[in-house]
């Protein structure tokens, strides 16, 4: 009878089908998309290139020290200095050394600054690059020691110094030992200056606190990346102190340029060439 005739269908286990669908679901790699803090557009990260610049508004995303090094100096010209220095915990601050280890694994750096010797379009230079990804680029004893030695070696070798700043200020976990670095670096910087050698600073986002109050603003020529946050105290602290509302662009690179604190704002994709031009202009070869 037709009633008992085998029907033309197959049985589907809904749980198994769901599991198969989940296994076939494409995985999206991390860091494929980013949102621009300036124009608020969602960007495909490959659009930004190695310089990590928004193609729509020109905003420069924060980049690490190794990324910065790769787009600034000549290939295979960098020689790392003082990577053997080890961070101590003078105040026995809870969890401090564990945090240092975690940051070292995350960034591939030994501390919040990378220092060494390299060439930029064939011109020898002592270079320091701070990394805000390493405890906000805060300045502790090792950061201070590495930058001090950078200036001392540059003075001995008669090299110009280029430093890319990116910092939240002094490292609170080291207390007064951190604050001491400001004076120590400034003394080495002054000896480099008395030797008649060039010092260029590039202020990047963010450059604040004790770094701003010491070597960041002491450059013979001070460059900055567009829209970088540059200042000493925080905006809220200043407003509460002076009891006035600050302009919207206060502590931005453009505001500082307008008020004479910065010599020039240079887009990241033009920085390498601008540094090369300045180094050549201030070298002996530049006067021949």
Curated annotation (Swiss-Prot):
EC identifiers of the protein: 2.1.3.15
Biochemical pathway: Lipid metabolism; malonyl-CoA biosynthesis; malonyl-CoA from acetyl-CoA: step 1/1
Superkingdom of origin: Bacteria
Cofactor note: Binds 1 zinc ion per subunit.
Any one of the GO CC terms: acetyl-CoA carboxylase complex
UniProt binding sites for Zn(2+): 36, 39, 54, 57
This protein's UniProt keywords: ATP-binding, Cytoplasm, Fatty acid biosynthesis, Fatty acid metabolism, Lipid biosynthesis, Lipid metabolism, Metal-binding, Nucleotide-binding, Transferase, Zinc, Zinc-finger
GO molecular function, one term: acetyl-CoA carboxylase activity
GO biological process: fatty acid biosynthetic process; malonyl-CoA biosynthetic process
Subcellular localization(s) per the UniProt record: Cytoplasm
Family matches, as Gene3D superfamilies: 2-enoyl-CoA Hydratase, Chain A, domain 1
Ranges for domain CoA carboxyltransferase N-terminal: 32-288
N-terminal signal peptide: none
Primary residence: cytoplasm
InterPro entries from the UniProt entry: AcCoA_carboxyl_beta, Acetyl_CoA_COase_Trfase_b_su, ClpP/crotonase-like_dom_sf, COA_CT_N
Reactions the enzyme catalyzes: N(6)-carboxybiotinyl-L-lysyl-[protein] + acetyl-CoA = N(6)-biotinyl-L-lysyl-[protein] + malonyl-CoA
Start and end residues, zinc fingers (C4-type): 36-57
Needed co-factor(s): Zn(2+)
PANTHER family associated with the record: ACETYL-COENZYME A CARBOXYLASE CARBOXYL TRANSFERASE SUBUNIT BETA, CHLOROPLASTIC (PTHR42995:SF5)
Subunit composition and interactions: Acetyl-CoA carboxylase is a heterohexamer composed of biotin carboxyl carrier protein (AccB), biotin carboxylase (AccC) and two subunits each of ACCase subunit alpha (AccA) and ACCase subunit beta (AccD).
Family: Belongs to the AccD/PCCB family.
Job description of the protein: Component of the acetyl coenzyme A carboxylase (ACC) complex. Biotin carboxylase (BC) catalyzes the carboxylation of biotin on its carrier protein (BCCP) and then the CO(2) group is transferred by the transcarboxylase to acetyl-CoA to form malonyl-CoA.
Name of the protein: Acetyl-coenzyme A carboxylase carboxyl transferase subunit beta
Species of origin: Enterococcus faecalis (strain ATCC 700802 / V583)
